Design a protein with these regions (language model features):
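ABC transporter nucleotide-binding domains
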Residues: 5-207, 213
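Alpha-helix termination/capping residues and helix-transition junctions
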Residues: 19, 197, 240, 270-272, ...
Length: 300
């Protein structure tokens, strides 16, 4: 582990492609933390995770896992990491049991009793050929093969992609049940904010190759608000700290702030506006507002 106790540490990481760049990205994951990496399709989530896993080299910056450099100590860094991606494939002709024995022969930390428990929880049959698994069952099989190794870091890259709403809900419910008594660290990427909100305690927003915000989930939900205001004729709403969007239509204004405090009511009252309603925002609404505000900022 790193000297400051971090499980994952990415510092000023950049990677340039022809039509996309990951720009000066920094990310840190603490022990026992579950971080949701949220971004639109093409935002850089998978690129970030592939660099973290050593599958793609960074052009610049530093990546450390359990204190080990991914550039010079990749084998040591990945020893305690379990990785599941939506594009991972198993041997179609082989059974799940064959895969379990294969993984157990490679990883000494394989826990057969835990594997049996996961088989039951995920409702999987070890004798079934992998080619006969549904997409949801395939994802569960991948999770079983990773979780039964008892990794200290679990990296999930868009694991619910392609699942119907019911299958996605069932998978996340089962995954949360499996993980609720665990102390491992998890990095979970998705473009679906509802998925991330269910499983994560810290949220990181990424857009166009940049981290645009990162905070504890509850901090996001408690600090963001949408305000409905009555605006008197001729009144001009002042620029208030934390306000990311203002929309005025006639005598009605909608204000979105990332730093809500009751004192904001007086600020607008002094300007000739009256706050009529204060609404909490969903994580999806917060994500969209964060991304749109970031895109309005001058390019760095």
């Amino acid at each position: 582990m790193s000297s400051d106790g971090l499980i994952v540490e990415m510092r000023n990481v950049s990677r340039k492609y022809r039509f996309f760049s990951l720009q000066d990205l920094s990310l840190a994951l603490a022990p026992g933390q579950i971080m949701g990496l949220v971004g639109p399709n093409g935002a850089g989530k998978s690129t970030t995770i592939r660099i973290l896993m050593g599958l793609v080299p960074a052009d610049s910056g530093e990546v450390r896992v359990f204190g080990h450099s991914m550039k010079t100590e990749q084998a040591l860094a990945k020893k305690q990491v379990g990785y599941v991606s939506d594009d991972m494939r198993l041997f179609g002709q082989a059974t799940l049991e064959w895969h379990m024995k294969f993984v157990a022969s490679i990883f000494p930390g394989w826990d057969p009793a835990y594997a049996a428990t996961l088989l039951e929880r995920f409702n999987l049959k070890p004798a079934q050929p992998v080619k006969g698994l549904s997409h949801g069952e395939h994802v569960k099989a991948l999770l079983l093969l990773v979780l039964a190794r008892r990794p200290k870091l679990l990296v999930l890259d868009e694991p619910t992609t392609g699942l119907d709403p019911v299958a996605r809900y069932e998978l996340l419910t089962e995954l949360m049940d499996v993980l609720k008594d665990e102390s491992r660290s998890i990095l979970f990427s998705s473009h679906n904010t509802a998925d991330v909100e269910r499983i994560s305690d810290r949220i990181t927003f990424i857009d166009r190759g940049r981290i645009v915000d990162s905070n504890d989930k509850e901090a996001f939900l408690e600090s963001w608000r949408r305000l409905r205001l009555d605006v008197h004729d001729g009144a001009t709403l002042p620029a208030a700290e934390g306000v990311v969007d203002v929309d005025v239509t006639g005598r009605i204004a909608t204000v979105i702030t990332r730093r809500y405090a009751p004192e904001l009511h007086q600020v607008y009252r002094n300007a000739g506006a009256l706050v009529r309603e204060v609404q909490r925002m969903t994580l999806e609404e917060i994500f969209v507002a964060t991304v749109m505000a970031s895109r309005k900022e001058p390019a760095k």
